Regions:
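Short hydrophobic alpha-helices and adjacent helix-cap/hinge residues
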Residues: 1-218
Length: 218
């Protein structure tokens, strides 16, 4: 949210922000949404798909600007990306998955199997993996998927991938991003390079990415 706050200040607009962080907890998110509605704020800015969906469900009559949402249509936030037809609009963080796959192949040119780990309940993650599958058609490479439903699953699922993959691709995924230190404690000793969908997970031990600048996106 820092990007939009700085942009508003740079334009000399007098706006007060009520910034809340749900800490990736859905119950916290629902409570924040209800409080925002009760406060009757004129506009809600939501970061990431879960936040945007929760705000949209709670605030039917309040304009909502979202960011860090990969696919607004798949998330059922808009009817059409060109003509939203709802009270939601915003910017997309769809990452250049084809370029990221090319990056993997530069690091591991003889790779035969690439793994990916993601939250199977997060629509954005599913969408990215489907694109990855299509991009893999350009290479003679097999994809092995590992899915989680919470941070607690990451260690076991990651361990299950080791020995089966030559590299690991991590899409933009809220659960995996928060569990990168756990993930890379497993991949690093196994010498499995981790290419990430965006910059944030690099600080948790990812090797490299070609991605979106989230500050500029805001």
């Amino acid at each position: 949210s820092r990007g939009i706050q700085d942009a508003v200040k740079a334009r000399g607009l007098k706006v007060t922000f009520d910034v809340q962080n749900a800490q990736a907890d859905q119950s916290n998110l629902a409570n924040i949404a209800q409080r925002f509605v009760s406060q009757e704020y004129p506009l809600i800015f939501a970061v990431a798909t879960p936040a945007a969906q929760t705000m949209a469900n709670a605030a039917k009559n309040t304009p909502i600007v979202a960011t860090a949402v990969t696919d607004y249509e798949a998330a059922k936030l808009v009817i059409n990306k060109d003509k939203p037809g709802t009270n939601v609009t915003g910017s997309s963080d769809l990452n250049p998955i084809g370029a990221q796959l090319d990056l993997i192949m530069q690091f591991v040119p003889n790779a035969k199997t690439i793994g990916t780990i993601y939250n199977s309940s997060e629509i954005n993650s599913q969408f990215q993996v489907e694109i990855l599958k299509k991009e893999l058609a350009r290479y003679n490479v097999t994809l092995v998927e590992g899915t989680v439903s919470s941070v607690n699953d990451v260690q076991q699922v990651a361990q299950g991938l080791i020995g089966k993959i030559d590299a690991l691709y991590v899409p933009t995924d809220n659960i995996i991003a928060s569990a990168m230190p756990v993930l890379t404690k497993i991949t690093t000793p196994a010498k499995v390079p981790v290419i990430t969908g965006e910059e944030g997970p690099l600080h948790g031990g990812g090797l490299a990415t070609v991605g979106v600048d989230y500050y500029e996106l805001g």
